[in-house]
């Protein structure tokens, strides 16, 4: 016999449940509304079992996708990982590769991918599944800035910046292949612009000397502080 249902995880609670349609066996899912901040914890928040929406920001080679995957894999509550680069590459024929130049077409596909990520994140959260997204969000370009993420996911999105040293991102970029590998000059340019996050009020993790598991642990610590005192952005 099945035991009693487990209590829901703390954090974002999503939409009220939708009654089951007993005539067809179809299982309706709650609609995904804007993600709000988790309610204040009575004590120290247990980030590993709290339903959250996280945005991991960083330059190419920062390790954000690897960290996001590891973090999602090792949580105590259901957690999804969405990489904007992966979603953008869903477009096969007609893919506007930003490496070929940033133009109206590549910007439109970026915006579409971001909106798709936001829609997915809201639906995951509405159904009790945490979500961590990763994207190279620039502090000095509103088009690819935080405003769009906040608009598409909701005010409860928790942004965190991964920013290792330049030599680290150059080494990691050299290990890449295909259209994910950039020139050293482009990597250095992106890394320099990402330094603009210093002084922004967002939490920043320098993972130059940290492996992926250690970075994920620091991410948990940063998120606990963000829940207790949300960053202004």
What do the predicted segments below correspond to?
Residues 1-42:
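Long, basic/Gly/Ser/Thr-rich N-terminal segments
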Residues 56:
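Hydrophobic anchor at the beta1->P-loop junction of P-loop NTPases
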Residues 59:
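P-loop (Walker A) phosphate-binding loop of NTP-binding proteins
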Residues 64:
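Conserved lysine of the Walker
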Residues 69-112:
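Conserved substrate/cofactor phosphate-moiety recognition/catalytic segment
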Residues 108-154:
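Glycine-rich phosphate-binding loop used to anchor ATP phosphates in small-molecule kinases
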Residues 178-218, 230-233:
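Small-molecule kinase domains that catalyze NTP-dependent phosphoryl transfer to phosphate-bearing small molecules
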């Amino acid at each position: 016999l099945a035991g009693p249902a487990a209590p829901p995880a703390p954090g974002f609670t999503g939409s009220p449940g939708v009654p089951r349609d007993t005539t067809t066996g179809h299982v309706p899912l709650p609609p995904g509304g804007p993600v709000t901040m988790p309610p204040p914890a009575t004590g120290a928040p247990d980030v590993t079992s709290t339903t959250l929406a996280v945005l991991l920001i960083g330059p190419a080679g920062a390790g954000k996708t690897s960290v996001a995957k590891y973090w999602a894999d090792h949580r105590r509550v259901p957690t999804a990982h969405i990489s904007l680069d992966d979603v953008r590459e869903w477009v096969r024929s007609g893919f506007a590769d930003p490496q070929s130049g940033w133009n109206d077409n590549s910007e439109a596909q970026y915006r579409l991918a971001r909106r798709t990520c936001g829609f997915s994140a809201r639906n995951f959260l509405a159904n009790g599944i945490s979500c961590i997204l990763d994207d190279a969000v620039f502090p000095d370009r509103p088009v690819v800035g935080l405003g769009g993420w906040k608009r598409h996911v909701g005010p409860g999105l928790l942004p965190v910046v991964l920013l290792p040293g330049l030599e680290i991102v150059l080494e990691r970029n050299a290990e890449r292949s295909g259209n994910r590998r950039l020139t050293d000059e482009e990597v250095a340019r992106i890394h320099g612009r990402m330094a603009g996050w210093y002084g922004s009020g967002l939490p920043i993790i320098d993972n130059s000397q940290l492996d992926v598991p250690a970075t994920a642990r620091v991410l948990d610590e940063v998120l606990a502080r963000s829940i207790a005192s949300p960053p202004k952005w």
